[in-house]
Structures are given as structure tokens and as C-alpha cells.
């Protein structure tokens, strides 16, 4: 009986693909070696311990309909579009060894005519006249009896968009999260004009088969029907939830300040697991009562633009004479935390 398993996703949904990955990883036999190939439409994928408000331009992501997805492995933030080919290698211990999966990817690139080398712990690079350029980045996860290595191959990614979403507006965040390292990158199409996702997947698959000396048929995972994977529905619900993608951020503090025609405002937030645990408001407004009331109401509020806006606007019932100021404040706060 074969110990290999090959899965290919037809979905471009990052939450779907990461849920599939998680389910396979949890239920696979310890003797199995798995290759999962997939790709995501416009998404910023952050590491398990990262703060999305620090790593990402969340406002621009919302404007451009770019999703946020938190993965279960560590490492930094990356932007995915359909110009990325994603791979995941899984195996039980003691056989799990990320150098094996790295070798398979390097062999696949070599078969396509690209000579690449491993650089540091996570990257694959090619040598160019301008120096080493990164074509692949990886992250890893291990449990007591198994491990996985997942990563991306930059095929024809829109590299201009990397900076759009991974270089956030300067916010006054004093964060405990891990700041991503920005790397010099290159697309494989610069080296292999016309290369396709399907060709890259085929090359990785053939290198996978060659390493283990076995061939198997691929299982196609489609979003058209719920995958036959244990606990997939629950895992997808968690993976797509605000509580996981945003709420799992490390604790951080945020200072907002603005001057309006009616006075200056400073708001200080302490945030844990996406919830405001402490809020302070300072103002030189002639009527500070609405701001003082707001500080109390914000404690326990989710750190979400819509929730903060609702909380600000709810004060209009108590302070109707300050309706215009409160609406202006609500719009500003919502915009500042997007």
C-alpha cells in the first residue's frame, strides 16, 4: 500500500485552502507523506504570532478586497495572488525532514531549467547580475509526531502589490509581534517566460514521485462540495473567522490623535486578542463629557472599525447636541483602525 498522498486544490480561497491543510495535517497517518498544491487569490497571509494591524495596510486591503489569512505556522507576512504557486509537504516523525522537501522543490526547479539554492532557513534564491533574488519562501510547523513545510513559488506575482499591503501606514503601535523581513524577490517568469502554474505543479509532483520512487493519482479538492475531511466545516469556520485572523494578534497598544475644529483628541488603546482592554480619551474640547463616556464604552469592544464606529455613534442618544462632532469622531476612528 502506498504511503504517498497528492492533493490539488481547485479553490482560490485562502481560508478554504488553509482549512484543508489543517485537516489533512491533523488526521494523516504518521506513516504518510503528503504533497498538497494550491494557490490563493489576493490575500495577505500572516504568521501565527503576528499582528495584522502592524504588518498590513488593513485599510487598503479592505478597499481592494484583499483577504487576511492567519496561518498556523510561524514566520512573516506575505502577499499571495494567482501568480504564486503554494506547496505543502507533510510527514510523520522521525521521517519528517524539511531538507527533503527543500531538495524536492530545488529538483523541480532544476528540471525546469532554473538553478536555485537554499538560503538561510526559509528561502530559495537564484543568482542574477543584481545579486541573489528570492523566488520561494517557506514556513514550518511541528507537533509531537508530525511536521509540515509549506511555502510559495513566485511565478508571475504582481510584485508591485507586495509593497501596497505589506508596508503599512505608520501607526503608533508598540507591538510584541514579529516584524516581517522584506526581501528582494524575483518571478520565475523572468527566468522562464510563459511558465504556468500547472507546469510548476507538474514539476514539483514529478520530483516528489522521483524522490520516493512511487506514483499515485492526485485527489482534487474542490470548493463545489465540502471536502470529505474530518472536522472540515468547523476548521473552515475557525480559519475564516475574525477571531482567528485578527483576534489572535499579540497584545499591543495604539495611540490615535487628531485635531478637529471643535478640539484635539487623543485615544489610547490597549488591545489583547483583538479586544480593547483599556481605553483612555484626552481632549481640549470645551465639552469633554462625550469623550469621557466613550472611553468607558470602548473597554471590552472588539478592535474592529465597524464596532468602534457603532460605539461612537451610540453616544448620540446621550449627547444629541454633539451629534455632528460624534459622527465626525466615529468616521475618523473607524478609518484610523482599518
Swiss-Prot record:
Record's keyword annotation contains Nucleotide-binding: yes
GO molecular function, one term: ATP binding
EC number: 6.3.1.20
Chain segments annotated as transmembrane: none
Localization: Cytoplasm
UniProt GO cellular component terms: cytosol
Family classification: Belongs to the LplA family.
Protein name, UniProt field: Lipoate-protein ligase A
Organism expressing this protein natively: Salmonella typhi
Recorded name of the encoding gene: lplA
